[in-house]
Structures are given as structure tokens and as C-alpha cells.
């Protein structure tokens, strides 16, 4: 995977691909790929974070996130390129793949 900061047009293309089938879209906020997930309860939110953390550790690409009861707020950025890269979109896609399990 090419590690580079995505250009404005690349961001729009990747964001459109990521969001094409999602009821609640990801957004670009403060130069980060962002989304808030809402679950039925804290246990589901924490289980989602655990699955996501295991994948993030495997890829050595860690999210900025926080949890408040049943909500998980996520911001993805690649510090090595000072912006959003394909690694952020890969992690976002993987996180979305965990959602049907909840």
C-alpha cells in the first residue's frame, strides 16, 4: 500500500466509494476521516472497539477514538504523512465490516 497523503480529488473518490452503501456516512473533519457509531449498549460498543483494535494493531495503524456509553467516536489520520492516506480508508472499511456482527 502506497503511503502518501491523499489529494483532494483522491479523498473525494475514496470517500464516495467508502460511503456508497452506508446509511451513516464517514466525513472529512479537521483533515481526519471521522464517524460516530452508535450501538445498543456499552458492551456492543466495547466489543466493536476490541475487534477494531486487534485489526489496527495487526496493521500498525491506530485510530484516534473515544467511547461514551454506547457511542464510539472515531477519527482516522496517518501521522507519517500528516493527513489522510489509503491506510485510513482501509481501517474504516474494516471497521464497517464489523458492524453487521452487532
Curated annotation (Swiss-Prot):
CDD domains: PCD_DCoH_subfamily_b
Species for this entry: Psychromonas ingrahamii (strain DSM 17664 / CCUG 51855 / 37)
UniProt GO MF annotations: 4-alpha-hydroxytetrahydrobiopterin dehydratase activity
UniProt-recorded name of the protein: Putative pterin-4-alpha-carbinolamine dehydratase
Biological process according to GO: tetrahydrobiopterin biosynthetic process
InterPro entries found in the cross-reference section: PCD_sf, Pterin_deHydtase
UniProt KW keywords: Lyase
Domain of life, per lineage: Bacteria
EC numbers on record: 4.2.1.96
Gene3D superfamilies, A to Z: Transcriptional coactivator/pterin dehydratase
Catalytic activity: (4aS,6R)-4a-hydroxy-L-erythro-5,6,7,8-tetrahydrobiopterin = (6R)-L-erythro-6,7-dihydrobiopterin + H2O
Family: Belongs to the pterin-4-alpha-carbinolamine dehydratase family.
Pfam family, one: Pterin_4a
